[in-house]
């Protein structure tokens, strides 16, 4: 049974901002196409910033850098164009039985890239997502799309995991949800404390995972993770 399907709108006018769409049409909500005049203004702002920082924009390799930079930003934040409500949900064989449950569904590692909303610098890593289905499931590939939909925005690591867990809870109403993320943050590697190889880990537990330590251990073991090195949120 298809669920969470909304009418999609697109705008074909203006500048095509993405060469390769990262999300299929079934997850598209809108396109952030803008006019050529608006794009030109963004280029001018980017050029002003680069010039102030000392970049020579008159060389053959840098004269198109402002344009490439703006396009790269739209590509890196394409998650704003997607909508998790457009993911198709299927029924399981559990019909009204509160104790009917499936085995754990675990997907990972799921590589992701995001932009920190504090400094607009990248952070990147991988995610593991698991849930114990009740009456609804989604295709395992959709877990990957869900992570990347929320990651390809200006965000923070904690929010990405929270949004994935919240969305699965609303869509599937499963017995439990587990989300683990680990990432390198360039805002700590390139600036500030300038630590070369810190790895930030966050975990999110819902339902049965939150109340059952053995389920958490089973999830972490299946993912090849150390249970004593994660920070729960």
Residue ranges and their predicted role:
Residues 1-233:
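A domain-level signal for the structural core that forms small-molecule/cofactor-binding pockets
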């Amino acid at each position: 049974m298809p669920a969470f399907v909304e009418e999609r709108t697109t705008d074909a006018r203006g500048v095509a901002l993405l060469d390769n769409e990262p999300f299929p049409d079934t997850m598209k909500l809108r396109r952030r196409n803008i006019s050529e005049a608006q794009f030109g203004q963004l280029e001018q702002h980017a050029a002003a910033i680069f010039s102030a920082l000392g970049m020579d924009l008159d060389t053959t390799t840098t004269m198109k850098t402002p344009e490439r930079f703006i396009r790269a930003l739209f590509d890196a934040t394409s998650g704003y164009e997607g909508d998790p409500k457009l993911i198709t949900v299927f029924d399981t064989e559990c019909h009204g039985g509160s104790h009917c449950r499936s085995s754990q569904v675990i997907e990972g590692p799921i590589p992701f890239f995001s932009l920190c909303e504090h400094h607009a610098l990248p952070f990147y890593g991988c995610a593991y997502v698991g849930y114990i289905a009740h009456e609804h499931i989604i295709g395992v590939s959709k877990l990957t799309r869900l992570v990347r939909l929320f990651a390809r925005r200006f965000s923070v690591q904690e929010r990405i995991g929270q949004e994935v867990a919240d969305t699965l809870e609303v869509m599937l109403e499963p017995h439990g949800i587990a989300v683990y993320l680990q990432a390198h943050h360039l805002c700590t590697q390139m600036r500030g404390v300038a630590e070369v190889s810190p790895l930030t880990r966050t975990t999110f537990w819902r339902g049965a995972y939150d109340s059952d330590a053995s389920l958490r251990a089973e999830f972490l073991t299946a993912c090849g993770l150390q249970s004593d090195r994660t920070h729960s949120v």
